[in-house]
């Protein structure tokens, strides 16, 4: 325990004059400046040993941000969560290195460079030169590092920037190269041709996880749907009608699929332009085509989809039509233009017949499975090639209109098909649907067949699921919920990008297909061995980026002619591959620090927002499983999303959130930290950020904490005639002799320490905040309120108790409000830093015995239970006063307290009278109260609007049961269960309100009183009748309050005596005279004059 004593008032300085209402931003700047000068962060890291084999290290992985954009509230939130746990673990004696990292590669960096260069196409990049473009990328990626460092510093987040890693550094890139080679050697990296989400602007594919990370990837888009009727080959005037939302894909329609068990109909319109023709449609979807079919259409027959399987139709467009196209080895080959069955067909929309083209993943899988050869008619900019000459050069979405026009009129390329075989545009409609957009540039994506390198996630999926069970997820439902389900449905990961600024894919291939060869490299030394040197830039420096690594070319060893050469494929790795490699690449593993990596893997703790279950969390897990057969992390917090004040996504345009720097300047960082860390967002929910919410944090947390410190210093400095009281830590042998209020506070402090410790051990940061908030109420609104007189009387036990508690409390508060805790703790103790102090252990973690502090912070369950009941009585009674609009300064005659263990509460009769301003209190057991007609009635109110969507018609039965009393409270969940004709039905939070009401049989007494049930049982009844004496005393106490305000305005010391002159309305003079002695005593008035006047006036002069 600390040897420090307080005060240092006689030493001068801040502790002698603690401000009652400080500027928290100014205080924080002072603390930050002190930390910088003292090098406190580095000292906190160095003070704890690593231990043998680094066993005493707590390993934290910091997810790397991009530094080519300014930080925002999301970074702020995550940064605070990243700081809390390492601070706590450091105080527990663990060594916690906090190395910062930077994501520097990938399209975000390229797009920023393009913006700065004023270019927007790949052609322009290639024209200026890849080397110059990559130089621009390098310059842009660390553009805002200073802003980031200032921002992180201001939020009091301790990180090591000096030793931070960057994904563009050669050691990091070499480790990434090694990882790719390992995956390749294990058969987990392969090249494939698949349909992938593809960005036309960036000219590169995306991975499936990139479409699921953020909600705004999918945006509403208006398109035109078409239902195209294709002519059946084996039936006159019969057409199969397929449906698509992408008209531009119709020129490459190669097949149709139906549901084998779905009901279809062959219908013949009897009127309109389609009269006499027959159309195959899904039976359930006929209502969608009433206009086209007319009123009196004929159902020729009904059939299952399986009966359509194998039937053939004529192609819509002529580009891949004719005998040659339908022959072996050509597109689409002999199986093209055939109807097949598939299990993914439904009748939710469309026709029940699904168009198959090589621009959908399911489509491509079907075409491949049926032996249909397909082709890609788009170039890498998603413009039609010469394979579709009528639309050559048209961008895919721009081609929709001419394709529709040709389908509508049967002209253009359709005119080349004989009319008796020609397809018909059966229906076209405008259609609004949720459509994926590129998360980097917001361009609508298409699904396009591309050649890409993949990680075979599906091969290791069972192991991914197994290892996930070893991870502690916060909140816990993410493990088998969002993350577990994502793993269960994981697809192979596309890792190659047709771009420029990134880690190169270390694959070299022969330029002559006659002599095929593939070489994959896993280190710079392997490259040097084969190519004679490392990749070097124009200055001769080793550089693994394009174009320098592309310059490594050698003769193909498998070519006896010596003419073919080995060239690197042009693709670079997905930047997520690098992010997923940070666990080992930051150490340059396996080339250096092999033992260090093995001792720091997996991480003990990581934290990011919930979307990273499809991003960084997921890819760390994939890479760790594939390479090391271990999880990458042990504990992970997935927090929710920060929303603007209107509940929408934060937007600079909408200005729907308070400026971060403005919040720091007005309220301080600790207030923002607390606002975020105490919210449901750390339990996975979302959070609306408002200035009011942050201001409330200052009022409810920051100021009360400071006020308790100010109160202590005010009285401690004033004691002994201004010489000060040397408050110190209590000793264990003193505790038993302390007053009950002191022992209660010590017991509650012990419970605070244990609750916060348990919560932070479990990474439940918001639960720790809840424990602190509850304790602040105990400390400020209970202990200090009820012990002021003892401090006035310079009671040593009160000083030492409050000092002991505040010192321990600041150590608990240190991770959660680090700067306020620092300022208060240093002011109390004169110590170097609370962040260099030990956590206030009350129980030794190794032995389970009480520590020295634990023998002072002694728990006393009986005392705590009794005092909590007393506080409950006070809270309930004050609520009654507020409801009755009777101020606390107004005395009342009687309070009735009914409780189970009433004797325990009765022992605090005087305390209750003083706290509640009550003249008399009657105490009664529940049994005695019932005998006198007093009881608690339990009522259930069902919120039909909230419960209706879930319960449907059952909600009416729930309401009826609530009124008839056919319900009970489930003992385990605490939720009400109502009886319905279908059985018992449990209501969920938000669907109901439980009300406990006091019922009095005596109507006369009930009319003159108000009552309230207490949360843990029992109730209070407050007599609200007022007589002349009570009103007079109430007025006198209002006068006392006005005098105290005048003392404060005159800047008088708490011990200063005064001469008092009161101006009082004539009708109130008698009230003042009646309570003259009370007023003089409470205000320290040595002389007291009363004058008549129009309104109350107060004059105070130091006596």
Swiss-Prot record:
It is an enzyme of class 6 (ligase). The keyword Iron does not apply. Its cofactor is Zn(2+). It catalyses: tRNA(Ile) + L-isoleucine + ATP = L-isoleucyl-tRNA(Ile) + AMP + diphosphate. ATP binds at residue 652. It is found in: Cytoplasm. Coiled coil: none annotated. A motif ('HIGH' region) lies at residues 65-75. Its EC number is 6.1.1.5. GO terms for molecular function: aminoacyl-tRNA deacylase activity; ATP binding; isoleucine-tRNA ligase activity; tRNA binding; zinc ion binding. Belongs to the class-I aminoacyl-tRNA synthetase family. IleS type 2 subfamily. Monomer. Catalyzes the attachment of isoleucine to tRNA(Ile). As IleRS can inadvertently accommodate and process structurally similar amino acids such as valine, to avoid such errors it has two additional distinct tRNA(Ile)-dependent editing activities. One activity is designated as 'pretransfer' editing and involves the hydrolysis of activated Val-AMP. The other activity is designated 'posttransfer' editing and involves deacylation of mischarged Val-tRNA(Ile). This is Isoleucine--tRNA ligase. It comes from Bifidobacterium longum (strain NCC 2705). The lineage of its organism: Bacteria, Bacillati, Actinomycetota, Actinomycetes, Bifidobacteriales.
């Amino acid at each position: 325990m600390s040897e420090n004593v307080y005060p240092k008032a006689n030493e001068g300085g801040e502790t002698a004059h603690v401000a009652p209402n400080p500027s928290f931003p100014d205080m924080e700047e002072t603390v930050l400046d002190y930390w910088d000068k003292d090098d406190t962060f580095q000292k906190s890291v160095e003070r704890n040993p690593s231990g043998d084999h680094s066993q005493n290290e707590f390993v934290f992985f910091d997810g790397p941000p991009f530094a080519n954009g300014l930080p925002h509230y999301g970074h702020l939130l995550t940064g605070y969560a990243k700081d809390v746990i390492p601070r706590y673990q450091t105080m527990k004696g663990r060594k916690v290195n906090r190395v910062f990292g930077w994501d520097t590669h990938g399209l975000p960096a390229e797009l920023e460079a393009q913006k700065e260069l004023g270019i927007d196409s790949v052609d322009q990049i290639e024209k200026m030169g890849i080397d110059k473009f990559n130089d621009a990328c390098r310059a842009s990626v660390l553009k805002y590092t200073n802003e980031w460092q200032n921002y992180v510093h201001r939020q009091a987040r301790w990180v090591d920037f000096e030793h931070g890693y960057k994904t563009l550094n050669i050691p990091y890139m070499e480790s990434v190269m090694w990882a790719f080679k390992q995956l390749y050697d294990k058969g987990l990296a392969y090249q494939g041709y698949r349909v992938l989400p593809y960005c036309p602007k960036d000219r590169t594919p995306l991975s499936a996880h990139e479409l699921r990370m953020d909600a705004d990837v999918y945006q509403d888009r208006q398109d035109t749907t078409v239902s195209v009727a294709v002519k059946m080959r084996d039936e006159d005037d019969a057409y199969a009608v397929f449906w698509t939302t992408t008209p531009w894909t119709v020129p490459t329609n190669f097949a149709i699929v139906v549901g084998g068990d779905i009901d279809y109909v062959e219908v013949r319109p009897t009127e309109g332009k389609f009269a006499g023709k027959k159309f195959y449609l899904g039976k359930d979807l006929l209502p969608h085509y009433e206009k086209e079919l007319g009123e009196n259409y004929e159902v020729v027959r009904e059939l299952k989809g399986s009966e359509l399987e194998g039937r053939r139709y004529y192609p819509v467009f002529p580009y891949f039509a004719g005998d040659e196209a339908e022959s072996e080895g050509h597109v689409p080959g002999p199986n093209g233009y055939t109807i097949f069955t598939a299990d993914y067909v439904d009748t939710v929309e469309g026709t029940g017949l699904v168009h198959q083209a090589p621009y959908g993943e399911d489509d491509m899988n079907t075409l491949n499975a049926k032996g249909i050869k397909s082709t890609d008619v788009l170039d890498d900019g998603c413009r039609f090639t010469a394979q579709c000459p009528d639309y050559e050069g048209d961008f895919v979405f721009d081609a929709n209109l001419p394709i529709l026009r040709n389908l509508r009129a049967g002209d253009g390329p359709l005119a080349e098909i004989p009319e008796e075989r020609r397809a018909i545009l059966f229906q076209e409609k405008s259609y609004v649907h949720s459509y994926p957009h590129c998360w980097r540039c917001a361009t609508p994506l298409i699904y396009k067949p591309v050649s890409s390198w993949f990680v075979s996630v599906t091969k290791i999926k069972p192991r991914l699921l197994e290892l996930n069970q070893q991870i502690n997820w916060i909140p816990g439902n993410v493990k088998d919920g969002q993350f577990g389900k994502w793993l269960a449905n994981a697809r192979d990961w596309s890792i190659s990008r047709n771009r420029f600024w990134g880690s190169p894919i270390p694959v070299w291939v022969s330029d002559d297909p006659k002599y095929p060869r593939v070489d994959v490299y896993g280190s710079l030394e392997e490259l040097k061995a084969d190519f004679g040197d490392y990749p070097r830039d124009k200055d001769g420096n080793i550089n693994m980026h394009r174009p320098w690594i592309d310059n490594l070319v050698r003769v193909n060893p498998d070519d006896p002619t010596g003419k073919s050469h080995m060239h690197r494929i042009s693709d670079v790795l997905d930047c997520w591959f690098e992010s997923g490699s940070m666990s080992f690449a930051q150490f340059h593993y396996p080339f250096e620090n092999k033992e260090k990596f093995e001792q720091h893997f997996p991480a003990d703790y990581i934290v990011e927002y919930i979307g990273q279950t499809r991003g960084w969390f997921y890819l760390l897990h994939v890479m760790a499983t594939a390479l090391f057969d271990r999880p990458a992390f042990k504990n992970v917090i997935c927090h929710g999303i920060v929303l603007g004040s209107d509940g929408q996504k934060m937007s600079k345009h909408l200005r729907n959130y308070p400026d971060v720097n403005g919040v720091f300047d007005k309220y301080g960082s600790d207030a923002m930290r607390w606002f975020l860390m105490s919210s449901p967002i750390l339990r996975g929910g979302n959070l609306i950020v408002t200035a009011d919410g942050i201001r409330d944090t200052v009022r409810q947390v920051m100021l009360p904490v400071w006020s308790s410190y100010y109160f202590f210093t005010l009285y401690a400095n004033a004691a002994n005639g201004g010489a000060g009281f040397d408050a110190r830590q209590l000793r264990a042998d003193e505790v038993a002799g302390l007053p009950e209020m002191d022992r209660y506070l010590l017991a509650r402090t012990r419970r605070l320490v244990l609750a916060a410790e348990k919560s932070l051990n479990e990474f439940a940061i918001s639960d720790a905040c809840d424990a602190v908030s509850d304790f602040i109420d105990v400390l400020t609104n209970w202990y200090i309120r009820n012990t002021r007189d003892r401090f006035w009387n310079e009671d040593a036990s009160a000083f030492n108790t409050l000092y002991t508690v505040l010192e321990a409390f600041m150590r608990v508060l240190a991770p959660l409000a680090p700067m306020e805790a620092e300022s208060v703790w240093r002011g109390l103790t004169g110590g170097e830093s609370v962040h260099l102090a030990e956590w206030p252990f009350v129980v030794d973690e190794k032995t389970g015995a009480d520590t020295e502090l634990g023998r002072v912070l002694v728990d006393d369950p009986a005392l705590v239970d009794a005092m909590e009941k007393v506080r409950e009585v006070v809270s309930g009674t004050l609520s009654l006063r507020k409801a009755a609009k009777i101020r606390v300064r107004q005395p009342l005659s009687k309070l009735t307290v009914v409780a189970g263990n009433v004797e325990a509460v009765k022992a605090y009769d005087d305390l209750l009278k003083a706290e509640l301003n009550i003249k008399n209190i009657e105490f009664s057991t529940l049994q005695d109260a019932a005998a006198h007609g007093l009881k608690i009635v339990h009522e259930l109110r069902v919120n039909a609007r909230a419960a209706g969507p879930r319960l449907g018609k059952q909600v009416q039965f729930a309401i009826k049961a609530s009124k008839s009393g056919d319900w009970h409270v489930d003992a385990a969940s605490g939720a009400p269960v109502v009886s319905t004709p279908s059985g018992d039905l449990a209501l969920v939070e938000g669907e109901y309100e439980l009300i406990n009401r006091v019922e009095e049989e005596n109507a006369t007494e009930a009319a003159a009183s108000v009552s309230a049930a207490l949360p843990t049982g029992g109730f209070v009844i407050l007599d609200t009748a007022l007589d002349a004496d009570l009103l007079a005393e109430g007025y006198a106490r209002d006068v006392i309050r006005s005098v105290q305000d005048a003392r404060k305005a005159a800047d008088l010391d708490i011990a200063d005596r005064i001469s008092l002159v009161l101006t009082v309305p004539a009708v109130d003079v008698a009230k003042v005279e009646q309570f003259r002695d009370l007023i003089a005593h409470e205000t320290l008035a040595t002389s007291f004059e009363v004058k008549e006047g129009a309104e109350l006036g107060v004059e105070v002069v130091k006596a």
